[in-house]
Amino acid sequence: MKQLVTFKIHDGGQEYESFGVYDHKYSDVRIIEDFFSIENMREDYDYKDNYWWYDDKLVSVVDRVDIDDDKIKIMNDYGVAYEHSI
């Protein structure tokens, strides 16, 4: 089974969420690296409370919930979340 991963992004005065579907086996840091296409996450990218710097934004994994294949297809069809392979 896969997980629906919810990202919180702070971009200046704006805050929004984005979603991706990943295997259970990956850490939050590895998922952030993949989702935001960060080549090598460095220690100094760590900010606080599990937020990481990405360009001029703070990003974090705020939720991971199990999701079945039918729901993955629906999310994909509506362009809400896509399945990622690392």
Each PLM stretch: what is its role?
Residues 1-4, 17-18, 49:
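Short, surface-exposed beta-edge/turn micro-motifs
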Residues 3-11:
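A short beta-strand micro-motif
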Residues 5, 22, 68-70:
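Short, low-complexity interaction segments enriched in Ser/Thr/Pro/Gly
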Residues 9, 21, 37-38:
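Generic detector of N-terminal low-structure segments
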Residues 11-14, 79:
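Glycine-centered tight beta-turn/hairpin loop motif at sheet-sheet or coil-to-beta transitions
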Residues 15-26, 30:
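A short, exposed loop/beta-hairpin motif centered on an aromatic-Gly-Thr core
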Residues 38-86:
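Short, mixed-charge low-complexity intrinsically disordered segments
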